[in-house]
Regions:
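Membrane interfacial helix-start motif at the N-side
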Residues: 16-22, 26, 34-38, 65-80
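Hydrophobic alpha-helical transmembrane segments in multi-pass membrane proteins
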Residues: 28-53, 78-120
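Residues at secondary-structure transition points
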Residues: 21-24, 47-51, 63, 67, ...
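Hydrophobic transmembrane alpha-helices of multi-pass, membrane-embedded glycosylation machinery
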Residues: 54-59
């Protein structure tokens, strides 16, 4: 018993029909890039409240009308909340060790900040290409 090839591989017409529109791709890219804008405006790269306000606003406005923006907005929001949690934990470690923890926390803050910047830019590029990007090491708090 053999399976016809057209039942295994989706046709080009089906894959194009499922692709997000240019408008959805653009809004999804804005959801990711708004975290960068929030970081610039608040001066808190990676862990500040400004980093998740932009993705939250875009997600809340577009989630019901644009499925791709719903997915990528949640992803951007979850990633920025995860990074903020990591920064709070590092801050608490510093406070609890009366500053001695800075030996560990400063390099970790730098590494997490650089990773945040790189992953955010990659996500924006992928969203603009219509790819559903998943950030690594992200807590999926908003489903």
């Amino acid at each position: 018993m053999s399976i016809p090839p057209e039942s295994v591989i989706p046709s080009l017409h089906e894959s194009v029909a499922d692709a997000p529109s240019a408008e959805q791709r653009q809004w999804a890219m804005f959801a990711h890039l708004s975290a960068l804008l929030g970081a610039i405006l608040t001066g808190a790269f990676g862990g500040g409240w400004g980093c998740f306000i932009g993705p939250l606003v875009i997600w809340l406005i577009k989630k019901d009308t644009m499925p791709f923006v719903n997915d990528q907005g949640k992803e951007a929001l979850n990633f920025n909340i995860t990074v903020a949690i990591a920064f709070v934990v590092l801050f608490l470690l510093t406070v609890m060790t009366l500053g001695i923890g800075l030996i560990i926390t400063i390099p970790l803050w730098i590494i997490i900040g650089i990773c945040w910047l790189v992953f955010t830019i990659i996500a924006a590029i992928k969203a603009n290409e219509g790819v559903r990007y998943r950030y690594p090491f992200t807590l999926r708090l908003i489903k």
